[in-house]
Every structure is written in structure tokens, then in C-alpha cells.
Amino acid sequence: MSNFYELNLNELDKELSPLEKREWDNIYASYRSGTPLSGKVSGVDRRRIQDTPDESHDQLYFLVIVPYRVKIMIPEEETGFWDSREQAVRVMRGMFGTKIDFVITAIDRENSLCVASRKRAMEIQRRMFAQTNPQIGDRIETQILAAGSTSVIASAGGFDFHL
């Protein structure tokens, strides 16, 4: 990946359609200011990592989001599901079609690829939630992230919990 701030974005973006331009503008804004974006999980990708000292972790799993044409990948350790690697991968596979928030952390403009963090978006949500001063008995909007045969993982106010 090249340095984002060294790219000539006007040159790279001059032949984009209006939808592509809007997609990239949102990505640039998230990267520069750390503002969260939202998107639906379209799948889980597994990539082999070269030169890892621990061969049991020579593959990484990523949540994949494709808002329009750009592939946004969230590494397993940035999903927020890191009690155990097996649990993280199992939850990730159950998230197909789930809308999640994320913050762009790296951009590979030439390959239309970005890396993002759900954990950073959750930190922002937690700060915003704390400012609402929730009280016992208040109703709080909750989102179901994944459902398994014996449990459900939900998110509210930047916190994930198992039901």
C-alpha cells in the first residue's frame, strides 16, 4: 500500500462514476477523521500470511464489506470478537448480511481495497452512549449481530453481549 497522503486523488478519481466518487469520498473522510461508516457484511475472507513465527496463525480471517465497488476488509482482531480465535471465526461466519459500523484504517487506492476496524467504531459508540446518561429502565436500541443454535450475539451502545 502506498502512502495515502502522497496519492494524487484528483488524478485517480477523475474517471469515477458519481456513485464511485461518493463511495471513495466517504472512505477518505473516514480515514482522515476517524468517522464511522456502515455497511453490510458480504462474507468472510481467509488470507495466508507469509513469514509468521507461529504456523497455527499463518492465516487471518477478515469480514468483507463491499458498499459499491471497493472491498473493505476487517481483520479478525479488529472485529471485537476476540475471546478466542475459534469463537471469533465462528461469529464472523454467522454475520453474513449484518449491518455493522467500522472506521477505515488503511487505503490501497490502486487496488480498490481498504482495511477497517470495527473496534474503533465501537469505541466511538461507547463514548456517545455514555453521554446519553442511560438510566435503569431506559429502552436501548439493540442490534442482533449473529445467531447460533444456542446463543445470540447482540450489540448496543458500542458493547457486544451474548444472550
Predicted regions and their residues:
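Single-stranded RNA-binding regions, centering on S1/OB-family and related RNA-binding modules
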Residues: 1-163
